[in-house]
């Protein structure tokens, strides 16, 4: 997994502690289920109490998932690139759950491309990376349920949160 991906989005301090992810599993999409990793991710989100993520890529279907979770009172914090923010805002304006999104979603904008896509919750950490050719790898994701793995993910999130600025959703 690691050798096939661009690790430049992971800070050096985090790379030194990558052993915290040793109990992880790789979720791979297969020809009979090309959305295996994404489907698993959405299912896992449904049981989360807190969701924090970094997203330099955009999956429109995910905004509906976040809106439904926000409507249930789940607190969501996302660090996104400006391009992803613009796409999210355009779709959010059309969402019937727009008010719930505003109440329970905090968006932070980062100017640099993090080159890593991940979510950390109260019970799992899931990360996707870009391939060495620069394209995002939608088919392989690394998933950890361990305390060490989620702790590693929280530290990575804090790194990117510190490099971002909050966007005011009260538009």
Feature-to-residue mapping (PLM):
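Interdomain hinge/linker segments and adjacent boundary elements that couple functional modules
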Residues: 1-60
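Residues in well-ordered beta-strands of folded domains
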Residues: 27, 79, 108
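A structural signal for well-ordered alpha-helical scaffolds and beta->alpha junctions
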Residues: 34, 38, 90, 146, ...
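Primarily the HKD phosphodiesterase
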Residues: 41-96
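Residues that form generic nucleotide/phosphate-binding pockets
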Residues: 44, 100, 156-160
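HKD-type phospholipase D/PLD-like phosphodiesterase module
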Residues: 82-123
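HKD (HxKxxxxD) catalytic microenvironment of the phospholipase D
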Residues: 106-150, 157
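Cysteine/selenocysteine-centered motifs that mediate thiol-based redox chemistry or coordinate metal-sulfur cofactors
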Residues: 155-171
């Amino acid at each position: 997994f690691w050798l096939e991906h661009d690790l430049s989005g992971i800070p050096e301090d985090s790379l030194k502690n990558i052993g915290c992810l040793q109990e992880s599993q790789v979720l791979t999409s297969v020809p009979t289920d090309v959305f295996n990793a994404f489907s698993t991710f959405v299912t896992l989100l449904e049981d989360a109490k807190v969701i924090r993520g970094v997203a330099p890529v955009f999956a429109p279907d995910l905004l509906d998932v976040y809106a439904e979770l926000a409507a249930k009172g789940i607190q969501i914090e996302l660090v996104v690139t400006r391009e992803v923010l613009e796409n999210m805002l355009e779709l959010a304006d059309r969402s019937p759950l727009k008010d719930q999104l505003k109440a329970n979603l905090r968006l932070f904008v980062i100017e640099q491309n993090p080159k890593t896509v991940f979510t950390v919750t109260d019970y799992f950490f899931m990360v996707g990376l870009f391939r060495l050719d620069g394209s995002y790898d939608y088919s392989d994701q690394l998933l950890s349920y361990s305390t060490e793995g989620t702790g590693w993910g929280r530290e990575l999130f804090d790194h990117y949160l510190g490099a971002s600025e909050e966007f005011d959703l009260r538009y």
